[in-house]
């Protein structure tokens, strides 16, 4: 089975596979107040005012949303009449990068499971030492301080972990639902008409669909395969979210009222690292993959002339433009960063033999209350 190469640039034909990364030079990188590096795609001198506006608009909207102290980079809505279709068209997914990005997120999920399991083992060992040194006196003293700042912080961390696990499943479910929507749409068009609509890129597009998990059986019917990339992604995210919930509800973070202050602090330290790891690495990677796949499926829907209600509603509502980059830009480099998802997630540095794709953050401080639920999950 052929597949789309993970590197290279798309051809200049307007009928080609959508490519969101521009081929032009990149302007010098800037650094936001939060310390994030941002690169902006340069605009040619011959670009019209409308072209410049279409490039600048998502950036302006994302920056304003990412700086919101309340939303914390959550997806927001900005009133922009008559601009929806153009902006969406100019921000199509870079399908050619999808293979490498999918492989990166599968490795990220595996690394996340290893980190959580290792975290639980290490923290159990540290808690044994804490219990031994604190003695019964410390536990008795803590009985009367069940609402201490340490316990409040631990409660917030556990709430954030539960929310993160739910959002991971939600995002994975959105990808699966979008593929199911496209399957229904393709039933209304013959194979010949589909290839004609897709043009010269039809074989590459169909190969990508097969790899994602949508294929035609011997009877000529479109069928979903659970062993495709989307099915694997959905199952992997589901397993990881269950592990997160287990660590949170039955593992190292499930302390009783007799736990000492030292035990609570130890759990806060481990829990905050896990929370930061999941929110800043895995969730941002999952959003990036979801956005790429969704744009690819939406692009096919547009090519065959059958709009998807789910994907169209995600981007458009009457007079409203929903910015798909706001969450991603809130804590990570922009989607048009020339580096691959793998390079962005591991900081762009070379990995030594002892390094893993992801490493647990060293900073123990995580403001769990500043992480808002994803906008799409709360609708």
Swiss-Prot record:
Family note: Belongs to the chlamydial CPn_0499/CT_392/TC_0671 family.
Protein name per UniProt: Uncharacterized protein TC_0671
Region (Disordered): 1-37, 130-150, 332-379
Domain of life: Bacteria
């Amino acid at each position: 089975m052929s597949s789309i190469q993970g590197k290279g640039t798309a051809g200049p034909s307007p009928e080609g596979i959508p490519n969101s990364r521009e081929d032009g030079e990149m302007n010098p990188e800037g650094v936001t107040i939060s310390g994030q590096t941002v690169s902006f795609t340069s605009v040619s001198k011959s670009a019209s005012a409308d072209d410049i506006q279409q490039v600048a608009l998502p950036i302006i909207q994302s920056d304003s949303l990412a700086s919101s102290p309340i939303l914390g980079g959550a997806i927001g809505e900005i009133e922009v009449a008559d601009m929806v279709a153009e902006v969406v068209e100019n921000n199509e997914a870079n399908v050619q990068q999808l293979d490498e990005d999918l492989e990166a997120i599968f490795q990220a999920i595996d690394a996340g499971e290893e980190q959580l399991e290792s975290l639980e083992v290490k923290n159990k060992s540290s808690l044994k030492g804490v219990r031994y040194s604190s003695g019964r006196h410390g536990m008795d003293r803590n009985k009367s301080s069940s609402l201490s700042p340490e316990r409040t912080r631990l409660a917030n961390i556990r709430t954030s972990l539960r929310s993160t696990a739910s959002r991971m499943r939600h995002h994975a479910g959105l990808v699966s639902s979008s593929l199911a929507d496209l399957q229904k749409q393709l039933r209304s068009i013959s194979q010949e008409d589909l290839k004609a609509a897709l043009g010269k890129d039809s074989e590459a597009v169909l190969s990508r669909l097969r790899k994602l998990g949508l294929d035609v059986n011997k009877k000529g019917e479109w069928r979903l395969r659970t062993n495709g990339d989307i099915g694997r992604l959905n199952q992997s995210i589901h397993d990881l979210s269950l592990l997160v919930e287990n660590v949170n509800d039955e593992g190292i973070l499930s302390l009783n009222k007799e736990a000492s202050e030292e035990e609570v602090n130890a759990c806060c330290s481990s829990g905050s690292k896990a929370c930061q790891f999941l929110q800043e690495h895995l969730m941002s990677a999952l959003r990036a993959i979801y956005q790429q796949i969704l744009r690819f499926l939406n692009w096919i829907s547009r090519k065959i002339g059958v709009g998807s209600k789910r994907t169209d509603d995600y981007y458009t509502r009457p007079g409203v433009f929903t910015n798909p980059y706001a969450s991603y830009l809130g804590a990570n480099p922009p989607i048009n960063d020339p580096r691959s998802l793998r390079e962005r997630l591991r900081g762009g540095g070379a990995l030594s033999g002892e390094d893993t794709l992801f490493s647990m953050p060293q900073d123990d401080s995580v403001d769990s209350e500043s992480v808002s639920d994803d906008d799409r999950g709360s609708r």
